[in-house]
Amino acid sequence: MLMDAVDKIGWDGKEFDNIPIDKEFIEDSDVNDHNLALFLYQSGYLTIKGSNPRNYILGIPNTEVRTAMYSQILPRLVKKPYQVVSSNINIIWNSLYEGDVEQAMEGLKALVADTPYSQDNSPKAMEEKFRFIVKNAMHLVGCFVDEEKQTATGRIDLVCRYDTCILVIELKMTENGGLEAAELQISEREYTSPFMAQGKPVYS
């Protein structure tokens, strides 16, 4: 049912947290098959987490719902069968658990490899899509993830905190310089420095 709605209504890969939605719209609408956020609310995937005079603020209620939701959605975003995505997630989890960060990153690369690139999307839009995919993949393996983490020298795309290590991730499409530009930005802006004193190995 969830994936049927995603396919029918469409989804740009943006996060479903802190979404404002008109109070009258949410109260007067029947089951909605045109607005994905409203559909997810009516299906129990989102809940009202706050309000203001005009809007309700929708968000994912808890970790269990987030895990259930994105374990279904990620296969559609990366255009791979559920079994393949599940295998990649298990590789990442096992590798991190065993302390093999390099192998974990290979599993992450395998997960996002061949993800369709739409010519209608700018490099920035595609970077946001990949950031969403990576963020939720890392969430599924048990990381606490900070997105667009602000530091004194810049803003880091993702900081993933695992039990035994911290991963600093910067994402750039080829049009924006790719891996070389991402590594240079991490180095020049010393993105790993703020986390060195936290008692865990820091990788980038």
PLM features: residue spans?
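Nucleic-acid nuclease catalytic cores
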Residues: L179-E183, E190-S204
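Extended alpha-helical interface modules used as scaffolds for assembling large macromolecular complexes
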Residues: M1-A182, E188
